[in-house]
Every structure is written in structure tokens, then in C-alpha cells.
UniProtKB/Swiss-Prot annotation:
It catalyses: 2-deoxy-D-ribose 5-phosphate = D-glyceraldehyde 3-phosphate + acetaldehyde. It comes from the Bacteria. This is Deoxyribose-phosphate aldolase. CDD domains: DeoC. The keyword Cytoplasm applies.
Length: 223
């Protein structure tokens, strides 16, 4: 298995410096990761540095709480794409989902999908650690209905990360034609392979180099 091509090499910490981002970009070039996943402020730099390399530029929208307005999320998406993003990972309105306001949740995702149409993949972060299984299923169903390309477990900034059980449930819910991304707490090759076996088609990690080299000692969390 070419695990590198399934990994979004991630650095999203608030104190990330340009030097940190450049290191992630160089590692992505060297190990040929699927993408670098960075905060919006770094998109332009990453797009310039990765031009001509087979590495996508992924950024985050409404991150990490998902509590921005729909209009803000749509604007963030357009702005990120204009600066060179080719993938966007958006956070759903978790509170609206818990309130049973499925219409708002779906519209929120739909507007981001429309803003990205034909220009960037949309991955929908449902923040599994805050949801019941029934809510996880609903979040996945609404994501598919709204036209998302992927559903994703976690921001890495809440109370928990990806589990194989959640990945299996999400895969079962979305079917074979929508991607499932495991993120949050994936630090070893064994972790990554467990997620893929459960149904993940992409893995978000900051310990990506350690995962590829199968080196548990090198694993750190940059979420």
C-alpha cells in the first residue's frame, strides 16, 4: 500500500511559523503526500511552493468550531481557492445538527460545495467525538445530499479523534462513491492502516513522515 498518497500532511497549530510550513511543504514534496493541510493564511505560499508537484493544497474552513455563518464559510472557500487551494476541509455547524436543524446543516455544506464547484474538493468535518452514532449518520447523510466529496472525522482540536468504529460507520453511511477521511490521533503506520482497513480513503496526520517511515519515535501532533 502506498500510504503516502493517502495522507494529508497537516499543520494547523495556532503558533505555526513560516519555517514550520516550509518544512511541511518540503516533506510533502519528498514523500509525495496527497496534500498539505494548512491554515488559510498559508495557502498562497503553499500553492506557489508546490506548483509543478503532484501535491494538493488543502485548507480549513469554519475551523475549528464550525460556528461561523454559512456566508462566512462560503467566502472563506472562495478566497482560499482564489489563493490556490485545491481541497477544503469545512467544519459543520455542530450545534445546529444537535438541535435537529438539518436544513441549516445541509445549506451550510451546500453553499461551501457551490463555492468550490469544479475548483476544489470539499471534505466535511463532522467532529465525531461530539456526536451520537445517530448524529454521525445524519451528518454523513446531509453531507452526501449537499454534494460533498468526503466526510471527515475530526478537527483534532476537540475532545477526541478518529476511531476505526467511526470510520466503518461513516463508510457504511456514505457508500463507495464518497471519500472518508480519518483525522485526529493518527500517529503511527499501524494507526493509519487500521483506518484504511475500516474504510478510510484519506488520512489526516502531522506525524506523516513517521507513518511513512514506520518510525513511532518521530510521531508528534501538530494539530
Amino acid at each position: 500500500m502506498n500510504i503516502a498518497k493517502l495522507i494529508d500532511h497537516t499543520i494547523l497549530k495556532a503558533n505555526t511559523t513560516k519555517e514550520d510550513v516550509m518544512k511541511v511543504i518540503e516533506e510533502a514534496k519528498e514523500y509525495k503526500f496527497a496534500s498539505v493541510c494548512i491554515n488559510p493564511t498559508w495557502v498562497k505560499l503553499a500553492a506557489e511552493e508546490l506548483a509543478g508537484h503532484d501535491v494538493d493544497v488543502c485548507t480549513v474552513i469554519g475551523f475549528p468550531l464550525g460556528a461561523s455563518t454559512t456566508e462566512t464559510k462560503a467566502f472563506e472557500t472562495k478566497d482560499a481557492i482564489a489563493k490556490g487551494a485545491t481541497e477544503v476541509d469545512m467544519v459543520i455547524n455542530v450545534g445546529a445538527l444537535k438541535d435537529g436543524d438539518d436544513e441549516l446543516v445541509e445549506k451550510d455544506i451546500y453553499e461551501v460545495v457551490q463555492a468550490a464547484k469544479g475548483k476544489a474538493l470539499v471534505k466535511v468535518i463532522i467532529e465525531t467525538c461530539l456526536l451520537t452514532d445517530e448524529e454521525k449518520v445524519r451528518a454523513c447523510e446531509l453531507s452526501v445530499k449537499a454534494g460533498a466529496d468526503f466526510v471527515k472525522t475530526s478537527t483534532g482540536f476537540s475532545t477526541g479523534g478518529a476511531t476505526a468504529e467511526d470510520i466503518a460507520l461513516m463508510r457504511k453511511t456514505v457508500g463507495p462513491n464518497v471519500g472518508v477521511k480519518a483525522s485526529g490521533g493518527v500517529r503511527t503506520r499501524e494507526d493509519a492502516e487500521k483506518m484504511v482497513a475500516a474504510g478510510a480513503s484519506r488520512v489526516g496526520a502531522s506525524a506523516s513522515v513517521a507513518i511513512v517511515l514506520n518510525d513511532a519515535k518521530g510521531a508528534t501532533d501538530n494539530y
